[in-house]
């Protein structure tokens, strides 16, 4: 039976990562693949949704002349409009990516790529998020100035996706992170989230009128424990596959309830 797949991202509808993933998925599977993605770069937007301004959907042509839908909003907006206005139904799968830059650790809540995947899962679709490690922000925010091998990552995502098609989907979201030197033979490791992906840094600067302004930046963390997504990608150079859930309830709920319920 033909699958319905909604393909989204946070790097914008004209990203080469999105195009590579669309082409590989379309060629491999019996699927209707519909692209609904932001008009502009939306990195770091998380699962933000537009409540105070109207949204527009514009049909557009991708680089291979196939059709996509550009949304004047966030990745989450793209999923909402994709489900309710473009497809007018919940797809079988929402696939978000290929993101330029890895999405690792608990900081993934800031990721528009993951935000879209979580929104897809919230609507009842099976969701995957996929990201490719890059070594510098230059590659992430100035796509096209240096070559990035999206096709290898797209094929790795395809191969991982295949593993879950024959089984009941095991969780709400599958988060896939691919090291920048990966091949199709790179080992795949099932991981948990690391605590941190970056060590945050705030740089203060002074404008011509002697007022302070700030840039937020971070330094990659390399020394997370074995078994985490950060360690798998950055140290072992493996593909990381992390199962995620929409339920953010603390794991120690019973202990918490026993300790605190009588205090309220």
From Swiss-Prot:
Localization of this protein: Cytoplasm
GO cellular component: cytoplasm
Ligand binding (a divalent metal cation): 10-11, 43, 99
GO function terms (MF aspect): 5'-nucleotidase activity; metal ion binding; nucleotide binding
Cofactor note: Binds 1 divalent metal cation per subunit.
Pfam families: SurE
Catalytic activity: a ribonucleoside 5'-phosphate + H2O = a ribonucleoside + phosphate
EC assignment: 3.1.3.5
EC category: hydrolase
Main location: cytoplasm
Family: Belongs to the SurE nucleotidase family.
Role this protein plays: Nucleotidase that shows phosphatase activity on nucleoside 5'-monophosphates.
PANTHER family: 5'-NUCLEOTIDASE SURE, PHOSPHATASE, PUTATIVE (AFU_ORTHOLOGUE AFUA_4G01070)-RELATED
Protein name (record): 5'-nucleotidase SurE
Organism (species): Methanococcus maripaludis (strain C6 / ATCC BAA-1332)
């Amino acid at each position: 039976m033909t699958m319905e797949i909604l393909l989204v991202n946070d790097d914008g509808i004209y990203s080469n990562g999105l195009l590579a993933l669309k082409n590989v998925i379309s060629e491999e599977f019996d699927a209707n693949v519909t692209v609904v993605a932001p008009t502009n770069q939306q990195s770091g937007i998380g699962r933000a949704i537009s409540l105070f301004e109207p949204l527009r959907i514009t049909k557009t042509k991708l680089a291979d002349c196939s059709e996509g839908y550009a949304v004047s909003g966030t990745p989450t907006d793209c999923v909402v409009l994709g489900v309710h206005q473009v497809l007018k139904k919940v797809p079988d799968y929402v696939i978000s990516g290929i993101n330029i830059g890895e999405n690792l650790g608990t900081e993934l809540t800031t990721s528009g790529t993951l935000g879209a995947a979580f929104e897809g899962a919230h609507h009842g679709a099976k969701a995957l998020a996929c990201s490719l490690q890059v070594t510098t922000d230059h590659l992430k925010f100035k796509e096209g100035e240096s070559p990035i091998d999206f096709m290898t990552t797209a094929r790795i995502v395809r191969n991982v996706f295949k593993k879950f098609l024959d089984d009941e989907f095991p969780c709400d979201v599958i988060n896939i992170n691919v090291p920048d030197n990966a091949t199709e033979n790179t080992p795949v490791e099932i991981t948990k989230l690391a605590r941190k992906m970056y060590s945050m840094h705030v740089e203060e600067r002074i404008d011509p009128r002697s007022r302070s302004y700030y840039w937020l930046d971070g330094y990659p963390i390399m020394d997370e424990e074995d078994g985490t997504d950060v360690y798998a990608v950055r140290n072992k150079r493996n593909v990381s596959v992390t199962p995620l859930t929409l339920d953010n309830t603390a794991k120690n709920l019973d202990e918490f309830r026993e300790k605190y319920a009588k205090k309220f």
